[in-house]
Amino acid sequence: MTTKEKIIITSLELFAQKGYDGVSVREIAAKVGVQASALYKHFSNKDEILNGVVSATSEKIKESYQVNQIPEAVKNKDEITQSYEAFSTRQLCDLTWNIFQLFTKDPMVSNFRKLLMREQFENKHIAKLYDDFFVEGAVNNFAKIFQQFSADGFFKPVDSRMIALHFYAPIQLLFQKYDCEPECESQIKELLYQHIELFGKNFSAKN
């Protein structure tokens, strides 16, 4: 691991624990085990470190989507609907659970999510990041996919944004439940699977 990568990972851990404003560059440097002057060779200030965290986490999410063969990450746009149609309900549930675990268990992605949740009320820039990653941005991304599903006859001709809200809102709630009660993982997994099954029954054009 390079010094720059250590700075990013350590900074994210500290930000998630203490809040963005509660961590100094000097503290980050000490935790990494370098002088502050060495840290400044990679990042000129704390805002640049945050930008590095965002870029690194975005890349981690992208790589995880590719590893899990998420269709929108590995297929052409005109192949996405067909790819999802080929999945069984169980496969869709397993796929969704894998991504749920990415956002709740992966150290980098989980800390990033917690950082944005924690700091959204204190920092407008971080509030915008939270909205882009986990609220409006997520809903918009799902809406685009579901709009294509409806256009291709896979889903019922329902407003795609409403479909996205029906899909994503329960998952956001389960994120919160996991953060509060990680010991209830098996129950959360069962709820997630039930949600995916019911969602498919409600919006599939075959039903």
Question: Which positions does each model-derived feature cover?
Answer:
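Short, basic, alpha-helical segments at the C-terminal edge of helix-turn-helix-like DNA-binding modules
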Residues: S55-K62, V67-Q69
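Short alpha-helical scaffolding segments that buttress acidic/His motifs in well-ordered protein cores
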Residues: T96-I99, R113-M117, F167, I171, ...
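Helix-turn-helix
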Residues: K6, L14-T57
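Hydrophobic/aromatic-rich alpha-helical bundle segments in the mid-to-C-terminal region
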Residues: K128-D132, E136, F146-E197
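Short alpha-helical elements of helix-turn-helix
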Residues: E5, I9, K114
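Amphipathic alpha-helical packing segments from all-alpha helical-bundle domains
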Residues: R90, T104-A151
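Hydrophobic alpha-helical connector segments
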Residues: Q66-D106, A164-F167
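Residue-level detector of well-ordered alpha-helical segments, enriched
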Residues: V53, Q91, L95, M108-F112, ...
